[in-house]
Amino acid sequence: MAKQYSQLFIDFTASYETYQKVTDVLGVTPQPHDSNEIPDLWFYRLERCSEDRQEDFINHFLDLLEPNFEELERLGINRKNILFWYVYEYEYQCSMSFTPSGLLRLGESGITMNIDCHDFTHRKSL
């Protein structure tokens, strides 16, 4: 079954305190980090199956970030430290859509977005 992962990455100088403060500021639970290392990356993910309604992750992530840019900057986190990463596993056809308002907001925010597409049907035959 195809899956889609909408991911928010926030890079910072390694610090348990900063990791916890980012969690508190954004008010969502990040993916667990390696507890043996001091975290330098905060990572939040939305996951869905292809049959589900497409999540408007751009607007969702910006709704989390925009009211908190000043607080994040006080933690030493600038927009260049933030990345949206969309990973799309597909079978037969890669098809995705984004709202105009989301793309406009993303462009105005100065945040980078990466998109990776993987045809998982090739992995089935391996």
What residue spans do the PLM features occupy?
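Acidic (Asp/Glu-rich) sequence patches and key acidic residues
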Residues: 1-126
